[in-house]
């Protein structure tokens, strides 16, 4: 029996999940979990990438302690951030977080030189200041000139483990630098940044064998002999693979620090309507596209908890929130002011004050406000998606950590007026494992993998119901105008 390890690292935590296929069912075991985050060093918010590598080795040593001497391994992480590699293969600096303030106004500055419509037609990717395109636009020229290669985070981890440099396509598409038509890094865009296309590794599809873990790591650490497979390395791409969907008329919501809501399509949509609504066409596994909108997610709730010194668990916060009427206050969760404020609680209160709403005071009121606002935003985006794609959405599959928030799931079902299916919460790691198993011949296809997922995990169901959607939508429109 083959053993598979998913290295799944998000913006706030990481984990190593051991998986195996037994009687057409996936069995998972969490082997190691660790915290992740950025710290302010050398003038920027930076990821502790060396510490992440150490945590991976600690996790693999725990796998070996289970008596497993050989395994298959795949890596997924958050998107857009990168590591600059020098001529000798060394890391030139710790990677800067997408939440760093260096890209403020970068979209405006670059698009004043290079029209938005032109960039969108080429790439089909939504405009966000965190995109790699804008990070490289403001990157230190000296570092860029010294860099032989630019590797996104999961590709860098794979490189450290195996010595092989690739640019996996699902994650590379989030950079806003891939040409949809040519299926390559766009030389024209890169030349505008004075970056040679050769600084990027060869584009590689999800499901491709990468290589074996280097001997030096086997000698330094007591870890299994691992075959590394390049999975869908963008965590959302893996989460969509791990979605237990069936049929055609469905949408997905990968709910975590970010909310990524969209549809899986066979072809991109980069027309005027998609451009106007700032939708993105991220590449998916096995020739698919993730037509989606990137929305703020549970980050806001996480920050409320932090400002409260974690006196309440997230379950307790949701319980407190249920004591208040919904939609008493509505915030635009995608407003840039909520991206990384000094104090999230103060920012929410100030927003409500500025927009003529009552100010939420308690932890329950604040949480109620955020969950209600998120659900409303999801419903509005599903409505827009239907208009742009012409496809009727009958079901929404919510996966990731947010699938455990029953209040948010039920509010979404009611506002959107469709059935909501919630779970599994570890869809990203599951999608990571499924791609590995397809590579190894244990699972036939992504469709077959999704059937196995449905048979392996409990999926929650939330029915739609009557709610004052149009009235609430009108109130939200007025809030936006006020703001």
Swiss-Prot record:
CDD domains: ASKHA_NBD_FGGY_RhaB-like. Its EC number is 2.7.1.5. Belongs to the rhamnulokinase family. Its cofactor is Mg(2+). The keyword Metal-binding does not apply. Pathway: Carbohydrate degradation; L-rhamnose degradation; glycerone phosphate from L-rhamnose: step 2/3. Involved in the catabolism of L-rhamnose (6-deoxy-L-mannose). Catalyzes the transfer of the gamma-phosphate group from ATP to the 1-hydroxyl group of L-rhamnulose to yield L-rhamnulose 1-phosphate. GO terms for molecular function: ATP binding; glycerol kinase activity; rhamnulokinase activity. Keywords: ATP-binding, Disulfide bond, Kinase, Magnesium, Nucleotide-binding, Rhamnose metabolism, Transferase. This is Rhamnulokinase. The keyword Thylakoid does not apply. GO terms for cellular component: cytosol. InterPro entries: ATPase_NBD, FGGY_C, FGGY_N, Rhamnulokinase. NCBIfam families: rhamnulo_kin. ATP binds at residues 11-15, 257, 302, 401. One of its GO terms (biological process) is glycerol metabolic process. It catalyses: L-rhamnulose + ATP = L-rhamnulose 1-phosphate + ADP + H(+). Substrate binds at residues 79, 234-236, 294. The active site is at 235 (proton acceptor). Disulfide bonds join 352-369.
